[in-house]
Amino acid sequence: MIKSTLIFRDDGLPLCSSVDDDTDPSLADQKKKVKVLISRFTPQSANEATLESGAYEMHYVRQQSVVYIVIVERGYPRNLAFAYLADVRHEFEHSYGNEYVKPSVRPYAFVSFDNFLQKTKKIYNDKRVQGNLDQLNSDLLGVKQIMTKNIEDLLYRGDSLDRMSDLSASLRQDSKKYRRSAQKINFDLLLSQYAPVALIGLFFLFLVWWLVFR
């Protein structure tokens, strides 16, 4: 179940937060962790990730200097969580354009957006429609490729969300290895295919030369 939604500017300014009926102290603690997490972002941080935190999971998406975060109960389908965030992001961008970048913007300046958050959360929490949404989005979101980390490691053990440069370097290295292997395989294949033909051709030329010039 979706528990809470938070929208921040990537410099830490809170733009909007859902008004939640749940007064569980553990949920309030998750929101505090979110604020600390936002302060740890760097330009190299992953643009989307899942963070495990006790009985909850936090999913976030960074887009155009805005971070969209949803806190859900453990076990809530991850593809639905990211589909929900996509809906939230599209509506927020459509409703406010680039207003959030203005220096005069105050904290929670877009609190009226909670109306959309509440309606959309209700849809995604409805068991009768979750099955259809899950099936609809299963092929649209490559959630298996989204990084998953434990938030305690990020906040207290020095782990980082900055995987992008490491991932790019790894992909480049793997690409080089693959290219070298592919070149060797192609060369070996050509050799096995044409070496006998070349040898026969050379033998034939030698035979002609020997018969003509002996």
UniProtKB/Swiss-Prot annotation:
Keywords carried by this UniProt record: Coiled coil, Endoplasmic reticulum, ER-Golgi transport, Golgi apparatus, Membrane, Protein transport, Transmembrane, Transmembrane helix, Transport
Domain (Longin): residue spans on this chain: 6-117
Disulphide bridges: none
Segments traversing the membrane: 193-213
Domain annotation v-SNARE coiled-coil homology: ranges: 132-192
Residues in the Cytoplasmic compartment per record: 1-192
Stored Gene3D superfamilies: 1.20.5.110, Longin domain
Sequence ranges on the Vesicular membrane side: 214
GO cellular component: endoplasmic reticulum membrane; ER to Golgi transport vesicle membrane; Golgi membrane; SNARE complex
The organism's place on the tree of life at top rank: Eukaryota
Subcellular location: Membrane; Endoplasmic reticulum membrane; Golgi apparatus membrane
Topological category with respect to the lipid bilayer: Single-pass type IV membrane protein
Signal peptide positions (record): none
PROSITE patterns per record: LONGIN, V_SNARE
CDD domains the UniProt entry points to: Longin (cd14824), R-SNARE_SEC22 (cd15866)
One of the GO biological process terms: endoplasmic reticulum to Golgi vesicle-mediated transport
GO molecular function: SNAP receptor activity
Role played: Required for transport from the ER to the Golgi complex.
Family label: Belongs to the synaptobrevin family.
Listed name of the protein: Protein transport protein SEC22
Protein source organism: Eremothecium gossypii (strain ATCC 10895 / CBS 109.51 / FGSC 9923 / NRRL Y-1056) (Yeast)
